[in-house]
Amino acid sequence: MPILWSGRREADQLLEEDPLALLIGLVLDQQVKMEKAFSGPYDLKQRLGNLDAAAIASMEPEALDAVFRQRPALHRFPGNMARRVQKLCGMVATEYGGDAGAIWRDVSDGDELARRISALPGFGDMKVRITISVLAKKFGVTPSGWERHAANWHTVADVDSEESMAEARDVKRRMKAEGKK
């Protein structure tokens, strides 16, 4: 199932083809519209020339911050997101040899997949569940027991049209409102 999250084919294609771009998009997917979050990896790549975990991890924090703040800013909170993305890239570079796809490649089961994703900077319980849903529904990553760790609500993993994007937005908005009660 193709990814239709950013409203821009080239940005969606990058998410489909580059595991690091996918993870960066998932990190950015908070407190901004989904289209903005999932366009972010493409825009970051355009500004940097490529998406290389080791290169991003080794950048001066102020330099990456400036890239995130360049207009239009990559996120509503560019400084915080630059730090989170840099930490994520640092872990991908050191723990997985710069290969973000190695995080889910050859996992033995859903428990291991959930452990690996939850160890990533910026990935709390909800984001882990959403990521596992995305990996299963969009990329066929379905190790034994993955369902126990997947989101049981309509997420970006279920988006395949404008209508399902609106539904995912509505679910996200309702969950946020319920969390504030």
What is the predicted role of each segment?
Residues 1-13, 17, 110-119, 125-181:
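C-terminal accessory module of base-excision DNA glycosylases/AP lyases that mediates lesion recognition
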Residues 11-21, 31-33, 75-80:
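Structural motif
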Residues 16-19, 34-37, 43-44, 107-109:
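Short acidic alpha-helix initiation/capping motifs at coil-to-helix transition points
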Residues 23-27:
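Short, aromatic/basic-rich helix-turn unit that serves as a nucleic-acid recognition element
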Residues 30-39, 92-98, 139-142:
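Short helix-capping/linker segments at secondary-structure and domain boundaries
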Residues 44-119:
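Alpha-helical ds-nucleic-acid-binding substructure associated with the helix-hairpin-helix region
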